[in-house]
């Protein structure tokens, strides 16, 4: 077979373009969980307690860190640690949205006054919904749940929202 230099260059160029196109598309659509992975720091956000006992302050998430770890192409696990909050939650990823399965929990400590006695109460939040929405290096969260403590004396329907960022390199 006798090929000219221009034929060889065109064939190599076409092969390289197909290779690069294939690599680019797999990282976007084939492994969406990889886009969530990294260390995220909350620039803003809070958990609003929404309890039957007045005066329980919101849990501020500002400055707290959430580490997101890729489990497989469509699943991530998260670890949110901060003052008064600890959450280890698993999510299913579709595109730029990750959704938590119900039945998972977060642990929060809250200062409360019950019967005139001030105390700190450990509260387990049962997660009803929790989504992570990714836009570049910004992650928005939205969570709803239910919680009880002190034998049902404290009853809450907490919500959370916030925005976290990571270094442009993906953290």
Regions found by a protein language model. Give the residues of each.
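Short, surface-exposed loop motifs enriched in S/T, G, D/E and P with embedded aromatic residues
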Residues: 68, 87-95, 132, 164
């Amino acid at each position: 077979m006798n090929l000219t230099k221009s034929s060889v260059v065109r064939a190599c160029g076409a092969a390289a373009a197909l290779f690069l196109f294939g690599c680019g598309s797999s990282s976007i659509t084939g492994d969406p969980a990889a886009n969530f992975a990294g260390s995220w720091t909350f620039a803003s956000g809070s958990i609003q307690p929404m309890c039957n006992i007045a005066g329980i302050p919101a849990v501020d998430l500002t400055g707290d860190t959430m580490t997101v770890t890729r489990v497989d192409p469509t699943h991530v696990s998260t670890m949110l640690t901060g003052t008064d909050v600890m959450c280890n939650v698993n999510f299913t990823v579709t595109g730029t949205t990750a959704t938590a399965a119900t039945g998972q929990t977060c642990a929060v400590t809250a200062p409360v006054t019950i019967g005139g006695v001030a105390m700190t109460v450990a509260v387990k939040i049962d997660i009803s919904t929790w989504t992570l929405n990714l836009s570049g290096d910004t992650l928005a969260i939205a969570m709803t749940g239910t919680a009880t403590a002190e034998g049902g004396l404290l009853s809450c329907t907490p919500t959370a929202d916030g925005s976290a960022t990571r270094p442009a390199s993906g953290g």
